[in-house]
Amino acid sequence: MNQHYRDTRKIDPTKGALLPDGTPNDNDRVEIGPTQLAFREWENAGLVMPNLERMREYRWTRLTQHIVDRDLGGLLMFDPLNIRYATDSTNMQLWNTHNPFRAVLLCADGYMVMWDYKNSPFLSEFNPLVREQRSGASMFYFSNGDKVQQAASTFTAEVEDLMRTHGGNKRIAVDKIMVAGLKALEARGFEVHEGEEVTEKARAVKGPDEILAMRAACQSCEDAMHVMEAYARAEIPKGGISEDDVWAVLHAENIKRGGEWIETRLLASGPRTNPWFQECGPRICQNNEILAFDTDLVGPYGICCDISRTWWIGDAKPRQDMIDAMKHSVEHIQTNMEMLKPGVTINELSANTHVLHDKYQAQKYGCLMHGVGLCDEWPLVAYPDKHVAGAFDYPLEPGMTLCVEALVGEVGGDFSIKLEDQVLITQDGFENLTAYPFDPALMGEG
């Protein structure tokens, strides 16, 4: 049987010129995205696909409006996730977090310019909203040595020229910039404003296609979790399986679906779950003990799925104190979730939180909720004893997405329970985007 070139050049030969998300069905395209496995699973789950062209335009429009609303001439971004939000393009994302070679300037008139690695200007050409591709934004010592100031002067001269044409003033917001870059902007007479305030608030309210993309990413994350759970339950009782072995499954399954990375190493077993935040390591998991994790997973479309589960692995029943802690954790996140609706303020969420038992207070989580999108995002909802007056005086809005947290463990104990669900604020309440079940044995049902 002949295989035609028109089929071999497609990512999915069964589809037409476009994939279900509206992107080119071109096997050799530059743009990254979900794999056929992800699309099949989403179709089987009955999910509606996002349209990425609309999603990109929504983000660009929203960022531009936030610039105009603040009477800024432009927004200069170095954070790779802000660049992803503005352009939907990627380039060595983790390397870029500590070597800021990329920059994007979005001007008040919507004109957007990307400075990329000199050998890869093509990585954002798929998005027509990026009007120019340049290079030369690197202002870090590894790249420029003792000529950092010279590099900063050259780069900021380009920014000044663009702002003169497209900005209308010299008020510029900047998210994260090297010291030499900040000094060079100020030397050119720019009035520098806090860029993260702009980007975080713009990113906080998701558009319709972003919400569809998040549903898809959450489905892929949970599909990967199911594979990891099956592996853990089958292999740990046999012996010789490390925490790293289990965690590697989630990484692999994420990548198989077109996901991108995992932000943390928060998987621990047995006594290493208390205190929480011990990183996944070489410990050999034991039969009849707890395994807890927090996904912090950046999946398809660069969307973060940040959920936590705690499993009981073994053939015996968990202790009653473990069951009690698990039920208390579920009560905590479900009760707090019921407060969520448009108009409720961050301060009200803090003040009215479900109160953990005294024995769990010392080791409770760092927040009771936080925003989520491309990663953990604004806002943060603090517990009352960590609440800072004036830090988050804002109401919830439809389209915001939050993660609702619980960490329950006693000081000096031999286990912790970690739970977390991802939630969408709707027009009249909330929708829990997380379908993954709680462990029945720890719920006392096994």
Per-region residue spans from a language model:
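Active-site neighborhoods and metal-handling regions in enzymes and metal-associated proteins
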Residues: M1-G446
